[in-house]
């Protein structure tokens, strides 16, 4: 589903429509036991229920074994252009995990119900979300999330030089794809794809 990782310099891409498991929330993602950590638990519970469905009596049409894709996040703050990393408590977010094309809404509903029962975890916050990102600029950011502003500045300069402008709004959001496990990798080595919606200037 993700054939290659972006380069550490800006590139323009046309992102096709895709389906995701999604959980929405608000607040500081670093809060111990907060909404973010609960959302991640729900996402992975549903994702792995779908991945391992072939070992159950439930059969998904067209299923083949696959690797669960990386975690992704869409971020925004009310009345703020871009993202202000100094005010993490004001974050609104949608965390997602991409689904293979063969997984239907009915399959998703089965997984939510099954994960809730088997893992004794309320997964009702999960939703089946279709996202059509379209024209975007993206780059591989290396390092802490708090240092993303310098990488975003590189993206904005690239857009200006190539006749594009940022198109972040209430429907098209700042997007991050987390290629590293933050629990196992030092912050200075974290790999995060940053993706912004764009349009012609």
PLM feature segments, named:
Residues 3-201:
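A solvent-exposed interaction/effector surface
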